[in-house]
Amino acid sequence: IGYKNARNKLDLETLTDILQHQIRAIPFENLNIHCGETMELGLKAIFEQVVWRNRGGWCLQVNHLLYWVLTTIGYETTMLGGYVYSTAANKYSNAMIHLLLKVTTEGKNYIVDAGFGRSYQMWQPLELISGKDQLQVPCIFRLTEERGIWYLDQIRRQQYIANEEFLNSDLLEKNKYRKIYSFTLEPRTIEDFESVNTYLQTSPTSVFTSKSFCSLQTSEGVHCLVGCTLTYRKFNYKDNMDLVEFKVLNEEEVEQKL
C-alpha cells in the first residue's frame, strides 16, 4: 500500500494512515467469482492475491489481511462479525456476512473497516461511542448501541447526477439516511466466516454471484465499476453536494479500467 511510518508510533494517527493507504491501494472487488476462481480466506492465498498479484478482495479477505498487519505491528485488534442491511428487504441479513475490526489505541476503542467499499466506506476509524455523529469526507457516520447490538448508519449529502438518464438507476443511492450494518462485540475468528464465504460465492441468491464489482477510493472520492457501468463520486464537490458521474463501458474499456 506504499505506507512508510517515520513516526513509529502505534496511535490513532498511524492507524488512520494505514486505513487510508489500504482503501486507496486495495480495491473492494469480487472479480475472482466471475473469472472462475475462488475467493480464498487463508492468509497466504490473500497475500498472494492482493500483494503479489496487485488485486483486491471482499471484506472477508481485505479485513483479514488488515487484521494480520495491525496485530503484527502491535495494535490490540479483534475480529467482529457484521449483519449487512438490505434496503430492498428492509432488514439486516440473517447470517453474519461481514468482517470488521475493533482496535484499541490510546485508551479508546475504534471500529476499523477497509472492506465495505463504494460510497459506504469509512475513511477514518470510528470511535466506538453510541449516538455520536462522526464527520468524515464521504459522509457523517453514526454508531448506535441498543441492548448490546451496535448499528452503523450514515447521513449522506445531496448529490448532483451529471447524467440525467441515470437518475433512477439502481446503482444510485437515493436515501439521505442509510443503515449499513449491525454487529456485536463478540470476538470472532476467521474460521467463523468459512461457511458464509462459500455461500456468498456459490449461491444464486447472493448479490456477489449475480454482479461483478470493483471499487477504489481516491483522495477526493470513489470509483466503482459494477458490470460494465463505471461510476465516479466526488465527495463534497460544491455546496455540500456530491458529484456523481456514470459511464457505460465496452469490454475493452472495462479491461483498461481494471
UniProtKB/Swiss-Prot annotation:
Main location: cytoplasm
Residues the entry annotates as binding CoA: 199, 205
Annotated catalytic residues: 59, 98, 113
Keyword annotations of the record: Acyltransferase, Cytoplasm, Transferase
Pfam family name, one: Acetyltransf_2
Catalytic activity, reaction form: an arylamine + acetyl-CoA = an N-acetylarylamine + CoA
GO molecular function: arylamine N-acetyltransferase activity
GO terms for cellular component: cytoplasm
UniProt subcellular location: Cytoplasm
Binding residues for substrate: 97-98
EC number: 2.3.1.5
Function, in words: Participates in the detoxification of a plethora of hydrazine and arylamine drugs.
Family: Belongs to the arylamine N-acetyltransferase family.
Protein name per the record: Arylamine N-acetyltransferase 1
Source species: Felis catus
